Amino acid sequence: MEGGKMSSMGMDAASASVTVPPMQMQAGDQSNRIAIIISPRAGSSKILPFELVNGAANAGSQRHADPAESTPEAHHHLWHPVDLPKIKPPVPLVKKVGAEFFGTFTLIFTVLSTIIMDEQHKGVESLLGIATSAGLAVTVLVLSLIHISGCHLNPAVSIAMTVFGHLPPAHLLPYIAAQILGSITASFAVKGMYHPVNPGIVTVPKVGTVEAFFLEFVTTFVLLFIITALATDPNAVKELIAVAVGATIMMNALVAGPSTGASMNPARTLGPAIATGRYTQIWVYLVATPLGAVAGEGFYFAIKL
């Protein structure tokens, strides 16, 4: 009897378990959702609804169970090979030195030729023409050579860049040698082409020594401030480097040209001096320009911080 009761109770329990309605999810019903947190070891730490996790697990098991039925959607989250950008090899030092020689030769040849044309043709070029010639030469050379050597074309620039870590110290002497040699070569080329060569191609102060020193210091200071701001700061507009540096050369030439020749460049002064044998107060240009360059670059980093 009791066995009958037990069996009937078991049947009642079984029938009760069958008659319980399944839990249904209604759209927008957040009370029946179960959320799980993926452990930090997993690929994600997002909180996902239980039914999404369960569905993803079922989809994964189906892919492993029947690979033949795989679809592009099933492989959507799989890793695919990615083409990494190719790293360009560094430019050899010999090519950088060659670029500095060519660039300095072109710059000095252009400036000296413009000065000679102005003197031989009764001021046809004028100060504005000479300044424009120098600025345009620097602009096109920067556009052409900056990706090879940095297009310094100036020992003062190379010295300042070395002091602040933008040029390896081992590259400094080869750079300066190439720049001076390019200037000397251009000066002798001009001397051989134009007869007679007017001594006006040499930068000689037409003002007092202190004023000349100050002008060369300030103009080189401004030049290196602009170069450093555009060439070394990742936040600068790199597309304007050539135009800005060329405009700075032109501006400084208009300011200091009548007084000192607006050298801003020891190579600009040294090459013509050797070609003509005139060394009047050359120390002003060889000392003031590197000091102004280091001060200009240092000032930019000081106000940037």
From Swiss-Prot:
Short motif (NPA 2): ranges = 265-267
Q: Which residues cross the membrane?
A: 97-117, 128-148, 170-190, 212-232, 240-260, 282-302
Q: In which tissues is it expressed?
A: Expressed in leaves and at lower levels in roots and anthers.
Q: How does it sit in the membrane?
A: Multi-pass membrane protein
Organism equals: Oryza sativa subsp. japonica
Q: Give the encoding gene's name.
A: NIP3-2
A GO molecular-function annotation = channel activity
Q: Which InterPro entries match?
A: Aquaporin-like, Aquaporin_transptr, MIP, MIP_CS
Q: List locations, semicolon-separated.
A: Membrane
GO CC entries? membrane
Keywords carried by this UniProt record: Membrane, Repeat, Transmembrane, Transmembrane helix, Transport
Major localization listed first in the record, in broad terms = membrane
Q: Which family does it belong to?
A: Belongs to the MIP/aquaporin (TC 1.A.8) family. NIP (TC 1.A.8.12) subfamily.
* Purpose: Aquaporins facilitate the transport of water and small neutral solutes across cell membranes.
Motif NPA 1 in this chain: 154-156
Any one Pfam family here would be MIP
The record comments on the domains as follows: Aquaporins contain two tandem repeats each containing three membrane-spanning domains and a pore-forming loop with the signature motif Asn-Pro-Ala (NPA).
Q: What is this protein called?
A: Aquaporin NIP3-2
